[in-house]
């Protein structure tokens, strides 16, 4: 009966398997294995309390590492990491534990913000199974998270010893090199991002005629050719890498750029000699000789280390008419004007979302505060408007050229790591970027200076600090 039930279980026929498991328990009420298997069925169905009950019953009959592992997963699903850790630590005390227990324990420690213990558990897991790519990868990622890029690079390389062709590892290895400002090596490995879930991966959907139309540019002489470059990531990346457009113009006869439609007018205003294409312009209806994804530009240009930060002072600006429009409508006052943004695009990262009420210390200062929040998170504006004097600019942000017009009128921008922060930096506007503890690859180990933008200051969340505490620190510096 057990073999039949287990086969049904393996085939995903959970109700049929459960029925037989219960019949077995009627005859064998102390069968720990069956209680554990029933727990796994309930875990699969997300019936967590019932799963917990069954697996605890299994453990009361027999102490088994696999049972402890499954019980830990119940608490992981519940996001009760403290209890999960207690279960796994108890397993290590009571039974012989192998690789999987220590691997899960390392994950639990990380989720519970116990990073040193997480590191120790991963190292123990690797001691038990040195060829585990997932343990090497997670430990490397932990080191990257903890701003220890040299150790991250070491363990990403160990992953490659196990699986030399893992594009995901090669991509994350590039982020380690970026943190150390080794861009010559980092940009080479960064090309592996094109094998991940980006717009370029889905070229047949986003750019259906691209590969058939012309070859990728590999850095060869194109002085008599037309180059086409196109977006592949977020607004902030396009703004940050727009610094290379003048260099590209010098390399080719004609330059075509396809940014997102929200950036098109800003690029037209700043690069009048470049043909800026509309979002759904069809590649098969225009002429170009070679093409390149926008984030590949530094690599193909052969930029090394600090060369990548060219034009770090100011390379974008707003048009006079839009500056004047916002000045007359919003900025005719003598107060110190601060524009704030609390949330970027959560499609990419969710830890860049800041509780709007964390900005409260700014309202205790004699400033005039403006909201530049758009898209996701804009609904949070009312939480501030109900308590404080704050003006919403976003309803006039038809595209980034309008946003630039507004920013030209403010004295300071305070923003999460978002496109607004990149725009402020590219315009040379004083800007404070609020970084989570696990910050993005674009920022380096030394946060006392922003290499990309001279006008930007970086404030990083402490390991156990909250956004309210960070904002109080910032308020003292204004």
Regions found by a protein language model. Give the residues of each.
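Alpha-helical solenoid repeat scaffolds of the TPR/TPR-like class and their adjacent stem/linker regions
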Residues: 1-412, 417-478
């Amino acid at each position: 009966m057990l073999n039949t039930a287990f086969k049904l279980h393996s085939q995903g026929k959970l109700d049929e398997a459960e029925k037989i498991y219960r019949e077995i328990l009627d005859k064998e009420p102390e069968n720990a294995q069956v209680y554990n298997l029933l727990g796994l069925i309930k875990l699969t169905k997300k019936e967590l309390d019932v799963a917990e009950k069954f697996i605890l019953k299994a453990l009361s009959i027999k102490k088994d590492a696999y049972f402890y592992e499954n019980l830990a997963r119940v608490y992981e699903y519940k996001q009760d990491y403290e209890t999960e850790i207690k279960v796994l630590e108890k397993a290590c005390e009571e039974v012989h534990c192998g690789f999987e227990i220590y691997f899960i324990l390392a994950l639990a420690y990380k989720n519970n913000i116990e990073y040193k213990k997480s590191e120790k558990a991963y190292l123990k897991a690797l001691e038990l199974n040195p060829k585990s790519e997932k343990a090497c990868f997670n430990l490397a990622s932990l080191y990257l998270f903890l701003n220890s890029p040299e150790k991250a690079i070491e363990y990403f390389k160990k992953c490659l010893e196990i699986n030399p062709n893992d594009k995901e590892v090669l991509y994350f290895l590039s982020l380690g090199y970026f943190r150390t400002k080794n861009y010559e090596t980092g940009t080479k490995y960064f090309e592996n991002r094109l094998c991940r879930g980006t717009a370029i991966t889905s070229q047949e959907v986003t750019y259906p005629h691209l590969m058939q139309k012309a070859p990728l540019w590999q850095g060869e002489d194109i002085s008599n050719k037309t180059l086409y470059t196109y977006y592949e990531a977020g607004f902030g990346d396009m703004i940050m890498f727009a610094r290379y457009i003048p260099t590209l113009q010098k390399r080719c006869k004609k330059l075509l750029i396809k940014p997102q439609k929200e950036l098109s007018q800003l690029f037209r205003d700043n690069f009048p000699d470049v043909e800026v294409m509309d979002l759904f312009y069809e590649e098969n209806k225009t002429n170009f000789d070679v093409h390149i994804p926008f984030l590949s530009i530094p690599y193909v240009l052969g930029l090394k280390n600090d060369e990548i930060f060219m034009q770090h002072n100011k390379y974008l600006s707003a048009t006079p008419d839009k500056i004047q429009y916002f000045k007359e409508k919003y900025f005719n006052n003598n107060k110190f004007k601060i524009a704030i943004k609390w949330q970027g695009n959560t499609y990419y990262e969710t830890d860049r979302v800041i509780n709007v009420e964390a900005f409260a210390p700014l309202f205790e200062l004699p400033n005039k505060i403006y909201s530049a929040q758009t898209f996701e998170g804009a609904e949070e504006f009312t939480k501030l408007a109900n308590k404080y004097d704050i003006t919403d600019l976003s309803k006039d942000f038809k595209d980034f050229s309008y946003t630039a017009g507004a920013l030209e009128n403010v004295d300071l921008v305070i923003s999460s790591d978002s496109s607004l922060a990149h725009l402020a930096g590219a315009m040379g506007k004083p800007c404070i970027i609020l970084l989570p503890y696990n910050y993005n690859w674009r920022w380096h180990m030394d946060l006392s200076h922003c290499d990309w933008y001279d006008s930007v200051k970086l404030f990083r969340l402490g390991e156990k600090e909250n956004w309210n505490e960070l904002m109080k620190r910032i308020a003292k510096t204004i």
